[in-house]
Design a protein with these regions (language model features):
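Ubiquitin-like/PB1-type beta-grasp interaction modules and other compact soluble beta-rich domains
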Residues: 1-66
Length: 67
């Protein structure tokens, strides 16, 4: 198991997931729809398919759209 922190813009979650889980798995585990956020780690944007292999803290940026 690994610890994943998801923080930013009103979110502050800390969860445990199996090693090899994806960014999308982490978002799903806390009920955040992947299309509503951009996820980054150390100022690098991560695709939702990124595999997580150890404890990590992820920064969330809310995506807004409209006209």
């Amino acid at each position: 198991m690994m610890k994943v922190a998801l923080k930013g813009h009103g979110h502050d979650h800390s969860i445990e997931l199996d090693v090899g889980s994806t960014v999308k798995d982490a978002l799903d585990a806390v009920g955040i729809h992947p299309s509503t956020v951009i996820v980054s780690h150390q100022d690098v944007v991560l695709p939702h398919t990124t595999i997580l292999n150890g404890d990590v803290s992820l920064e969330l940026t809310i995506v807004s759209s409209g006209g």
